[in-house]
Amino acid sequence: MRTYETVTILKPQLSDNEVAEFLNSAKEFITKAGGEIVSEEKLGRRRFTHEIDHVRDGFYVYLKFRALPAFVKSWDEMAKLNEQILRSIVMLSIEIKAKAQTVK
């Protein structure tokens, strides 16, 4: 399994309860596919620099999870069909290890 990060932008008219419901259903979607949640964060409502589907702001949700590579396609299909989602992107999470420096 690989580690992925996703940022999903939800429609601004959703209530806090609806955002929480989406987050729970997204976590359930990941775990039912055999994945595991590493971390989650509600980033809140933010204004866009340009309109997306005639909307000026949205509610950002961040999830970090471990899943099989084939799961990403399932996530993308779900995001396209879910009317609460304006945009969603999944990225492969790469851990960068600091290199030790020697002092002369």
From Swiss-Prot:
InterPro entries the record matches: Ribosomal_bS6, Ribosomal_bS6_sf, Ribosomal_S6_plastid/chlpt, Transl_elong_EF1B/ribsomal_bS6
Q: What Gene Ontology terms describe what this protein does at the molecular function level?
A: small ribosomal subunit rRNA binding; structural constituent of ribosome
A Pfam family this protein belongs to? Ribosomal_S6
* One Gene Ontology cellular component annotation held by this UniProt entry: cytoplasm
**Keyword RNA-binding belongs to the record:** yes
Q: Name one GO biological process term.
A: translation
Keywords of this protein's UniProt record, alphabetized?
Answer: Ribonucleoprotein, Ribosomal protein, RNA-binding, rRNA-binding
Kindly list the cysteine pairs connected by disulfide bridges: none
User: What does the sequence similarity comment in the record state about its family?
Assistant: Belongs to the bacterial ribosomal protein bS6 family.
State the function annotated in the UniProt record.
Binds together with bS18 to 16S ribosomal RNA.
Which protein is depicted? Small ribosomal subunit protein bS6
User: Which species is this record about?
Assistant: Elusimicrobium minutum (strain Pei191)
Q: What is the lineage of its organism?
A: Bacteria, Pseudomonadati, Elusimicrobiota, Elusimicrobia, Elusimicrobiales
Q: Which gene encodes it?
A: rpsF
